[in-house]
Amino acid sequence: MKHMTRALVGGLGVTVLLVGCGGEDMRGFPTSDGSEEQLIARAASYELDTEYVPPPGEALHHHTAGFAKILCSGVFITGLDADDAAANVGGFISPFDERQYVVDTVIDYEQQMVSLTLPDGVTRTARRYGNQGCVAHPIGQSEVFFTPSEVERDLPPAETTPWPMGDVLPDDAWPAELDMEKVEQALEAGFGPPEARTLGLVVTYNGRILGERYGDGIDIHTPLESWSMTKSLTGTLIGVLIEQGVYDLWEPAPIPEWQGEGDPRQEIRIGDIMRMSSGIRINAPADPDFNEDFYADHYYLYTGTVNSYEYAATRPQQWPPNTIGRYRNTDPVLASYLVRLGVEGAGMDYHSFPQQHLFDRIGVRDGLIETDPYGNFLGQGLAFMPARDWARLGNLYLQDGIWEGERVLPEGYADYASEVAPAWDADGRRIYGGAFFWVNGEGGLGIPDTAYRMLGAGGQSTTIIPTHGLVVVRLGKY
């Protein structure tokens, strides 16, 4: 370990110095060079004759619902100061410059509830519901439309259990060829200065924690917002169901709303959805032809306080599946819907499923996924876990889905996650894989081309580097 690899890790390019150590056939499809002009032209060649209907409601009301949820989660899940959360968290679903329109803020610490009132008299509220996290309510409502569930954990005491199933780290010496001075330099560089707003950084080497850093008030058990890294967690839950025999990766997605006679959405496979290639029509900021005149469905699935699964499942098809790759929240919401359908269809408890069938198996004690008012996991971006728990999840993939000798994910599922999605490849953007992972197919990140990542807004990242046995997790305010 005498050389170092400089790697860009995270959506905002947080620089981390890492210590080095020794599908389908798309032939005949039009391709593009990845330019905006050609992306739009290529998509137009596949366009289906369906209508786009924008989300209902006023943008400011939606933004303020997002703000109430952000404050609730920041204060009652992560333990941030309310002013800190208001100034530094969640600007993409609740723009910071619109938070000034709130004329009254009430934070009820006993009820764990946030209420924000606007000049037109509309009040948006969000409340903590145990393991279902903070949930924003529809206008005029102060409760949710489901019975919150108590989720029990079946794990030994963390303080006496060795890593990775617990918190006790080995005190064995590292191999002599590992330059620990350079490791410390890498950790300092990766954590960055205060303006980087990093809250947690964990690096593991061959499954063992090589080093970690935390911000003020944050420790190894603090649940941190992951934003869209949650998508990869949702893809993992689908993988668990596939390993259990509930689903097959390439079966048509059994979405009830798609089962009408002649519905073309019946051709969409589960594997297409998790490649962000379903072709479902919405308006999303990452689209090359995003229409700013409408409030984005992509955000509405966070802030609409509707049945998010029903909303996503009733959007029409814009392109045939597996032809066009677009980063849209409908796909992870549809995958989350499939999790609920599969879990309940198999007679398992829905809200307990992530803990009992994934988290308990890999040592995760402090994770949760927030829901919409109907109790549906918002698997596109509202999971909270400590940095160490994201490292555990990354190591599950590094180990090809096997944990302590037991297979958790199907054989080859890590390959599916780390391979470039054919539709994205044909679009000239070799950046997205399967199971809602990002890939390094275009190179240029300073890490091996085989590396793949869970990514979330604001530089949230879990980077898996199989060739070097590394997993790097970075979480911070955004």
Residue ranges: model-predicted function:
Residues 17-20:
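C-terminal motif of bacterial Sec signal peptides marking the signal peptidase cleavage site
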Residues 162-206:
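Beta-lactamase-like hydrolase cores
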Residues 207, 224-250, 273, 335-339, ...:
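Active-site SXXK
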Residues 244-281, 285, 314-318, 344-385:
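Active-site helix/loop module of the DD-peptidase/beta-lactamase fold
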